[in-house]
A protein has these predicted regions:
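Sec-dependent signal peptide recognition
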Residues: 1-9
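Bacterial Sec signal peptide processing site at the extreme N-terminus
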Residues: 10-33
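Short amphipathic
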Residues: 30-37, 110-113
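Short extracytoplasmic
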Residues: 38-53
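Surface-exposed short loop/turn segments
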Residues: 51-53, 57-58, 62, 67-109, ...
């Protein structure tokens, strides 16, 4: 009886119509220009992530991006001796997505934040956190572009 139940479940789950979305099929656009405004390192990392994901030169949909980042660093945590133990980084990104064919402009605001520990490896911790936050921002921008074009 257990075998029959498992067999029936497998049959229904395999034929439910669920299909994974293949992002590579959705990438029918090319970024012709990325204009950056503020933080050079973060802007460069976002540009590299997007260019790596969107390298379809033969796509008919050409888009231009204008990216403006604001980075705020603040104290997140102190210990009993009032010494700083953690910092918080907020990255607020405003993106204009401009479609070349129609000159349609879409606005996108993204806010991400994270904390890193203060100490001997502070520079490495900060850089690693910034890289992680930039990947999140790039993924959100990419998803927004895919949803808008489809």
């Amino acid at each position: 009886t257990n075998f029959c139940v498992i067999l029936i479940l497998i049959f229904f789950l395999n034929t439910c119509g669920f299909k994974l979305v293949n992002n590579s099929e959705l990438l029918e656009f090319n970024i012709t220009n990325i204009e950056k405004k503020n933080n050079k390192r973060i802007d460069f990392l976002i540009k590299q992530n997007l260019k790596r994901s969107l390298s379809n030169k033969e796509a008919s949909n050409q888009i231009k991006l204008v990216i403006e980042n604001k980075v705020n660093q603040s104290v997140a945590e102190k210990n009993i001796k009032n010494q700083i133990t953690k910092y918080k980084i907020d990255i607020n990104t405003n993106v204009q997505i401009i479609t070349a064919q129609t000159n349609k402009i879409r606005q996108l605001e993204i806010s991400v934040f994270g904390t890193y520990e203060f100490g001997d490896t502070q520079a490495i911790n900060k850089k690693t956190l910034e890289d992680l936050l930039v990947k999140r921002i790039s993924k959100k921008i990419l998803n927004k572009i895919i949803l808008d074009i489809k």
